[in-house]
Structures are given as C-alpha cells and as structure tokens.
Amino acid sequence: MLSWAITFLIIAIIAAVLGFGGIAGTATGIAKILFVVFLVMFIASFFFGRRGRG
C-alpha cells in the first residue's frame, strides 16, 4: 500500500510541475492532436479488422 502512495505522490508532483510551469497549454495542444490520431487509427482498425474475419 505504501508503494501506491509513493506512486501517486510522484504523479502529483509531476502534474504540479507541469501545471504551474506553463506547459499546460502546450500539453493540451499535443493531447488534442494525439486524440485525433488515435481516433483515426481506432476507426481504421475497426473497419479493416472486420473485413478479415468474414
């Protein structure tokens, strides 16, 4: 249980550094781009995966 507490402490420290450091705007832009890329990859794999099972 102590390992989980240490893990969440490290995650909270990293989030605080990124949030208070001014990187939040850049990270938001990168996250939007990655979301669109992975959404397109998911849709493509869904359609191409269905064709192979028929």
Swiss-Prot record:
The chain crosses the membrane at residues 4-24, 29-49. It is a multi-pass membrane protein. Pfam families: DUF1328. GO terms for cellular component: plasma membrane. Signal peptide: none annotated. InterPro entries: DUF1328 (IPR009760). The keyword Hydrolase does not apply. It is found in: Cell membrane. Keywords: Cell membrane, Membrane, Transmembrane, Transmembrane helix. Belongs to the UPF0391 family. NCBIfam families: PRK13682.1-1 (NF010226), PRK13682.1-4 (NF010229). This is UPF0391 membrane protein Pfl01_0044. It comes from Pseudomonas fluorescens (strain Pf0-1).
